[in-house]
């Protein structure tokens, strides 16, 4: 191992404390990307940019002072925190991640450390505070997204090339500490800090600071969780330290992608969370979703279950409009997800990797009491769902999760079964619950081929 003095991971396996157990049980979250970028919605000076709307300042090369003049237009008159919270509740989200401050530097709370806040807009009120209360009132956990990279701050540096840069960046880190302390103090019910904008050389060169921030927040808010994206070790390694150990409480590198369900089973050894957009790459509000592929509700559900089947969480993103409302497509998506979760959520919440070999029909998940769920997305023409159990495990019974209708199970070979599809096609992805137990001896029934 690399020297014991290295600032890196404090653990290398799944944490079993109550906060991480709750994080794990939640499984489904919603992401809210909301900032000044919602006003232009991907368009600047008559030109529409197809890239991520929250990066428009960068795409269009807009000077910081000009960009921040958008604050004069920030007045989301249709914003209703209670409606937002009800939408998340109906979707089945157990937690919501909110962009307190994205790369542009605009703060949704009245920070006393910068002028670029909601307090200095026509709206004036503490948007973040309204959201925290509304979501908490619905029993939904609050997570704070926070961008360390800040395009509005004169002391931010992408890299440290001189003593002057070092001094300026030290001031910037102190500013960031103060904002984080402010958030932790103002909103003590926050359960998680999800850091972003931490990939620059300046931050990787200051790995000690990332460890300091994690410790500071955990001391201020016992039980708060921190994502791996914050951390860098003394060698500049991110997410995982130079010894290969996870930094932070859970891995957060799966953005708009997922681990392969056959090749990447190593992720089942630690906690992780993926996040996804609905268009291909739009986090903030963009006027024109026709510029890229837009996922259907079934495709979103597939990604949610995919994550859970490998022991991970999934966060589905929403980019509210500048007026504070959601586009109709996002409302419809939340409704569709919620309808399915109401029926089949038992196969998602508090579920984990089942240890069964992946099959083409969909995914397995495992409940806390050992029950195994088959979440079927692809109905086979054979009308038989192949199940291959781990060695020493047999399938005793199968039934539909939502109706308890018994499903026929036929043992076809050692540790292999055919599970029939339902007599009536559910017309949507459905769930079969398997009752499994330790297998009785079958040595005399099956023999391996001699080749």
Tell where the protein language model's regions lie, with residue ranges.
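Positively charged, low-complexity/disordered segments
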Residues: 1-8
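Mature catalytic domains of secreted/periplasmic carbohydrate-active enzymes
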Residues: 9-10, 14-451
């Amino acid at each position: 191992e690399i020297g014991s003095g290295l600032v890196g991971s404090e653990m290398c396996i799944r944490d079993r404390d109550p906060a991480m157990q709750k994080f794990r049980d939640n499984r489904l979250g919603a992401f809210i990307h909301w900032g000044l970028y919602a006003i232009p919605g991907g368009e600047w000076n008559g030109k529409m940019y197809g890239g991520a709307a929250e990066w428009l300042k960068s795409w269009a090369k807009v000077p910081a002072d000009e960009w921040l003049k958008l604050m004069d237009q920030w007045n989301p008159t249709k914003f209703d925190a209670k409606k937002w919270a009800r939408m998340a509740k109906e979707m089945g989200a157990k937690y919501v991640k909110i962009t307190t401050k994205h790369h542009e530097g605009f703060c949704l709370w009245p920070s006393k450390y910068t002028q670029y806040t909601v307090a200095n807009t026509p709206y004036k009120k503490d948007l973040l505070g309204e959201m925290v209360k509304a979501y908490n009132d619905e029993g939904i956990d609050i997570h704070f997204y926070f961008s360390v990279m800040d395009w509005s701050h004169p002391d931010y540096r992408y890299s440290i090339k001189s003593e002057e840069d070092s001094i300026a960046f030290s001031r910037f880190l102190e500013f960031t500490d103060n904002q984080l302390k402010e958030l932790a103090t103002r909103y003590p019910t926050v359960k998680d800090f999800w850091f972003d904008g931490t990939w620059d050389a300046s931050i990787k060169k200051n790995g000690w600071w990332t460890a300091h921030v994690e410790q500071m927040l955990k001391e201020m808010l016992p039980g708060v969780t921190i994502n791996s994206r914050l951390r860098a070790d003394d060698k500049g390694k991110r997410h995982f330290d130079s010894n290969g150990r996870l930094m932070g409480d859970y891995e957060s590198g799966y953005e708009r992608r997922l681990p392969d369900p056959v090749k990447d089973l190593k992720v089942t050894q630690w906690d992780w969370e993926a996040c996804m957009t609905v268009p291909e790459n739009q986090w903030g509000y963009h006027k024109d979703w026709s510029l890229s592929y837009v996922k259907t509700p079934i495709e979103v559900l597939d990604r949610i279950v995919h994550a859970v089947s490998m022991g991970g969480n999934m966060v589905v993103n929403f980019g509210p409009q500048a007026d504070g409302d959601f586009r109709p497509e996002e409302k419809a998506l939340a409704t569709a997800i919620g309808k399915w979760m109401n029926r089949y959520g038992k196969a998602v919440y508090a579920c984990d990797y089942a240890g069964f070999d992946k099959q083409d029909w969909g995914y397995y998940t495992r409940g806390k009491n050992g029950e195994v769920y088959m979440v079927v997305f692809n109905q086979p023409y054979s009308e038989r769902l192949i199940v291959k159990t781990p060695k020493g495990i047999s399938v005793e019974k199968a039934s539909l999760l939502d109706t308890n209708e018994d499903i026929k199970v036929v043992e076809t070979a050692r540790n292999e079964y055919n599970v029939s599809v339902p007599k009536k096609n559910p017309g949507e992805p459905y769930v079969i619950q398997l009752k499994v137990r330790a297998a009785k001896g079958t040595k005399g029934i099956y023999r391996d081929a001699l080749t």
